Regions:
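Active-site pocket-lining/capping segments in soluble small-molecule metabolic enzymes
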Residues: 105, 122-124, 223-225, 290-352
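Catalytic core of soluble alpha/beta enzymes
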Residues: 168-292, 296-300, 304-306, 323-332
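Active-site lining segments that contact anionic ligands and/or coordinate catalytic metals
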Residues: 31, 257, 312
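Residues at the C-termini of beta-strands that transition into short coil/loop
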Residues: 12, 136-139, 242, 291, ...
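N-terminal capping/lid subdomain adjacent to the active-site entrance of alpha/beta enzymes
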Residues: 1-189, 196, 207, 328-366
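Active-site donor-binding loop signature of nucleotide-sugar glycosyltransferases
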Residues: 53, 219, 317
């Protein structure tokens, strides 16, 4: 199939509540939507798809730069994509994979490879998981009653929840966790520390928890080299998340390592993700697809991708409740923005004569 048109849009979605990004908070999410049309030839098979490309970078509510997540900025990706559109028009869709492998921006590499997968129809017949792992954290403006009500409202089909820790005081967070377990003692907890504890703090915190209720704790220590000593001291399994963002990261099995929390927007192409997952699973390490706070468009694609790459795991994608509206794909919110309501950034299309020439050239090759 040949790429016949590409359109790039920018979005900015306000959030109804602040979302945690490590220890920081954001009140909106910004990103890009890339739409592509491809056809076999004039009058032949035709497909039109959209993908979200949204590095997790920018400014928090305190006007501080977000740290520890995407290395590239939205402006850098936008510039690269604007230039790339001129090169992609009229090319075979496999060219998307070539540019994905060449890109030094993980969010762009992932977006291009996802665009290729959707144009190829690889996500079409997939039935994604309906189960969720709800995210629980302590919003700055929420009281204990609100959190208790949220936990009490969870359906009995929910068996695990993700809890943000290393955000406030150890005492407050222990109170939060025991409050969750008091309301739903059957729940298993996935704790996410975002490297917020020193080794000593992590050990002190974990020692106060009932180990049999904890599936794992993500990135317990500020220095990931301390994770092994943390595990040896406490026996609580841990998962890696931010560690995967290191461009030099190579999987290495360690005692206590039980899971990789994989954020595709931060890591790169689908091929890179698949290779990492295959390696980790060969050592018995679980792989959990997780969001980078994408909009409904990105979350929809991640649910389908998780069903392909990690069919036996429930992905960690429960972040849409904070969004004020949906984007392109509805998740059930009252408002869903269409492409016509977004800011157009760039576009490129080949005309019918060029399409005919490309079709004729393809027939000659065959």
């Amino acid at each position: 199939m040949i790429l016949t048109s590409l359109n790039l849009y920018q979005y900015r979605l306000p959030l109804d509540v602040l979302l945690p990004v490590g220890k920081q908070r954001i009140d909106h999410r910004a990103g890009l939507v890339l739409q592509a049309c491809a056809s076999t030839n004039v009058g032949g098979e035709y497909r039109q798809v959209e993908v979200e490309i949204a590095p997790l970078s920018g400014i928090d509510v305190d006007e501080q730069v977000l740290v520890g997540f995407s290395r590239e900025t939205l402006a850098q990706v936008q510039t690269a994509l604007t230039e790339l559109l001129l090169l992609l028009g009229g090319q075979h869709i496999d060219t998307l994979l070539d540019y994905a492998e060449q890109s030094s921006y993980p969010s762009l590499a992932f977006g291009l490879s996802l665009l290729h997968a959707k144009l190829m129809g690889k996500l079409d017949a997939i039935r994604p998981q309906t189960a969720t792992v709800p995210l629980i954290y302590h919003p700055t403006d929420a009281g204990n009653d609100l959190l208790d009500n949220k936990v009490a409202a969870l359906g009995m089909h929910v068996h695990s929840v993700k809890v943000k820790v290393a955000q406030t005081s150890i005492e407050d967070e222990l109170s939060l966790i025991y409050g969750i377990l008091r309301t739903r003692p059957d729940l298993k907890l996935r704790l996410d520390a975002n490297r917020g504890f020193t080794q000593e703090q992590a050990i002190e915190f974990a020692a106060c928890l009932p180990l049999d209720t904890i599936e794992y704790i993500e990135e317990p220590c500020q220095n990931p080299q301390d994770n092994l000593e943390f595990y040896q001291a406490i026996g609580m399994p841990y998962a890696l998340d931010e560690s995967l963002n290191d461009p030099n990261y190579q999987f290495a099995m360690q005692n206590g390592l039980t899971a990789l929390v994989i954020k595709p927007m931060l890591l790169g192409s689908i091929e890179k993700l698949a290779n990492l997952i295959e390696t980790a699973q060969s050592y018995g390490v679980r792989c959990i697809i997780s969001s980078s706070l994408e909009s409904s468009l990105g979350i929809s694609d991640l649910t389908h991708l998780a069903a392909i790459l990690t069919p036996d795991e429930i992905p960690g994608l429960d972040t849409l409740s904070a969004f004020s509206q949906d984007l392109v794909v509805s998740s059930g919110k009252k408002h869903c923005l269409t492409l016509a309501q977004l800011e157009p950034i760039a576009q490129h299309a080949i005309d019918s004569t060029q399409q005919s020439d490309l079709g004729a050239a393809k027939r000659e090759e065959n």
